[in-house]
From Swiss-Prot:
Keywords: Cell cycle, Cell division, Cell inner membrane, Cell membrane, Cell shape, Cell wall biogenesis/degradation, Glycosyltransferase, Membrane, Peptidoglycan synthesis, Transferase, Transmembrane, Transmembrane helix
Protein name in UniProt: Probable peptidoglycan glycosyltransferase FtsW
GO biological process per UniProt: cell division; cell wall organization; FtsZ-dependent cytokinesis; peptidoglycan biosynthetic process; regulation of cell shape
Upper taxonomic lineage: Bacteria, Pseudomonadati, Pseudomonadota, Gammaproteobacteria, Legionellales
Keyword Cell membrane tagged: yes
Length: 372
């Protein structure tokens, strides 16, 4: 009995250490970046910090619960969960139900929690896609319909996300799906055809709507529109420049003083770069590399143990988190167009934090089942 109890409480140390380190750093940076705007909006400097702390506590509880749920349960209910996510995407578009913030209708109010539907959809899509790839592996590898079926579903999801609009979530879900299909053994030529179609669409966009294309590519020279479409990015770049090697010190950021919009959410990495400098940036990115690398290793072990659903699930979560990290940092550094994506485990955002922690709980369960 004692041996069984010890095993049931064992967790992957690297996943736990990296996740807790990221969450602690995120809590610290949210406190620093949000004090001024919180005081201005609510007359209390710790409003966003307290809310983030509550979400973090809920997230850790959710991760613990998820680590206790057998993977076969996720597999059994993946289709139903995907359907729930799909219905939520439709409901959020209804003016009576969906909550609009900054021109985007992405949230559903559930008591004191504003649920960002796209964050839920990312998770449930990976759950369902992993199940599809495991059940129809032969079809995926040998027949065109094995590629078209999941891409059709993802295309519908992306269309609904673009109606919100939430371009960033659509990009993450689509790229995660494509990468998982590639890992599952889809032949190369469907990807080539898709690439040609995307290139053709961009050319058509440039011809029919040059203004939209200009907005999409304004990140290439934000200084040309520094008081317009490039304002947020130029302020972010100034934060990077001020940070230098060692930063200006925790809490000493100037850009968070109403210069940089969304300083505690989408552009929190810029505040971190300003306050902690290049050293802080490298530390943060190192933690992400360790975490995502460990998740991939766990997926590989599951694949070697012939637990294909667990393997695809782990790969999907690694791709989701990795893509979101790359896009968020790329946006704040000015090498990618603005997408409106949070930095996993770091940025303020309850839905994102809860789903990230839930995903980590699932990974811990996969690691446990693979080892035992």
């Amino acid at each position: 009995m004692q041996k069984k109890s010890t095993i049931s409480w064992s967790y992957d140390a690297w996943i736990v250490i990296c996740t807790l380190s990221l969450l602690a750093l995120g809590l610290l940076m949210v406190a620093s970046a949000s004090m001024v705007i919180s005081d201005r909006q609510f007359g209390y400097p710790f409003h966003y910090f307290i809310r983030h702390l509550i979400y973090l506590s809920l997230g850790l509880t959710l991760a613990w619960v998820a680590s206790r749920v057998p993977i076969k349960v996720w597999k059994t209910y993946s289709g139903y969960l995907f359907l729930v996510g799909f219905l939520l995407l439709i409901l959020v578009l209804a003016p009576v139900i969906g909550k609009t913030v900054n021109g985007s209708r992405r949230w559903i109010q559930l008591g004191f929690i504003s649920l960002q539907v796209s964050e839920v959809v990312k998770f449930v899509t990976i759950l369902y896609l992993a199940s599809f790839l495991q059940r129809y592996q032969s079809e995926v590898q040998k027949e065109l319909k094995g590629f078209l079926k999941p891409m059709l579903l993802v295309g519908i999801l992306s269309g609904l996300l673009l109606l919100e609009p939430d371009f960033g979530a659509a990009v993450v879900i689509t790229m995660t799906c494509l990468a998982l299909l590639f890992l599952a053994g889809v032949r190369l030529w469907p990807f080539c055809v898709l690439l040609v179609l995307v290139a053709g669409s961009l050319i058509l966009l440039a011809i029919l709507s040059p203004y939209r294309l200009q907005r999409l590519t304004s990140f290439l020279n934000p200084w040309a529109h520094q008081f317009g479409s490039g304002y947020q990015l130029t302020q972010s770049l100034i934060a990077f420049g001020r940070g230098g090697l060692f930063g200006v010190g925790l809490g000493n950021s100037v850009q968070k003083l109403f210069y940089l919009p969304e300083a505690h959410t989408d552009f929190l990495f810029a505040v971190l770069a300003e306050e902690l400098g290049l050293i802080g940036e490298i530390l943060l990115m190192g933690l992400f590399v360790l975490l995502i690398g460990r998740i991939i290793l766990i997926g590989r072990r599951a694949e070697n143990s012939n637990q294909l659903y667990s393997a695809y699930l782990a790969y999907g979560i690694a791709l989701w988190l990795g893509l979101q990290v790359i896009i968020n940092i790329g946006v704040t550094a000015g090498v990618l167009p603005t997408k409106g994506l949070t930095l996993p485990f770091i940025s303020y955002g309850g839905s994102s934090l809860l789903m990230n922690c839930l995903a980590i709980g699932v990974i811990l369960r996969i690691a446990y089942e693979t080892e035992n």
